[in-house]
Design a protein with these regions (language model features):
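Alpha-helical substrate-recognition element adjacent to the catalytic core
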Residues: 2-115, 119-120
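An extended, acidic
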Residues: 96, 163-165, 176, 198-208
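Substrate-recognition "cap/lid" segment bordering the active-site pocket of phosphatases
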Residues: 97-149, 180
């Protein structure tokens, strides 16, 4: 028997974009670039690490900004209700070192993401992917485990996950993503997203 699982992106869906918040707090506008602007994740991360080193910003500086952030208003309630009816996993290209305080505020949902390499001085010197294309690969494995998967995200780095899932949904995407991926329904509120998730699972005989 198939079971239902929802996979969600974190930043831009459940939480604000961490790097945008860091850019605003530190006054370094170049740090505000996200996968919405640069779909090549390795190129984006190398640029971020270079900027952090040039400006002598370490993990404690970033964590200070994150601790002052909270989830998107309504995210906790949305997740709580969603988890009553479906299995829910957050698939994110963030890092455990960043996400911990935000997960606490969301009542510790399951999160698969990446990790950072920190030196003795607290500087971020490298990053380590869980695996290449982890979002898409996770969805593929869930399907192999006989789950019906509905995925939601907001950006370029979510589109492989959306494409691999039985159904994909965009949440607050930028216009360029809407233009390039017109096959996905677009939602702008948690109520709309929940309704679209329910509709997708209602079509299980068609999509699974």
């Amino acid at each position: 028997m198939k079971q239902s699982i929802v996979t969600l992106d974190m930043e831009g869906v459940l939480t604000p974009e961490i790097w945008i918040a860091v850019a605003e707090k530190t006054g370094i506008p170049e740090l505000s670039r996200t996968t919405r602007d640069e779909p090549n994740y390795d190129k984006l991360m190398k640029s971020r690490l270079k900027l952090l080193a040039e400006n002598k910003l370490g993990l404690p500086d970033i964590q200070k900004v994150i601790c002052a952030m909270g989830p998107v208003p309504g995210a906790r309630e949305f997740l709580d209700r969603l988890r009553e009816d479906y299995e829910v996993v957050i698939l994110s290209d963030t890092f455990y070192e960043f996400a911990h305080p935000l997960m606490r505020q969301l009542a510790w949902p399951t999160l698969f993401c990446h990790s950072l390499e920190i030196d003795a001085a607290g500087m971020v010197v490298n990053y380590h992917l869980r695996m290449p294309e982890q979002k898409r690969e996770a969805v593929k494995r869930f399907k192999e485990m006989n789950f019906t998967v509905v995925a939601a995200g907001d950006s370029y780095n979510d589109t492989a996950m959306l494409g691999e899932a039985h159904a994909g949904i965009l949440f607050h995407p930028p216009q360029n993503v809407i233009r390039e991926f017109p096959q996905y329904p677009v939602t702008y509120s948690f109520d709309e997203l929940r309704a679209e998730i329910d509709r997708a699972f209602a079509r299980v005989p068609e999509i699974a």
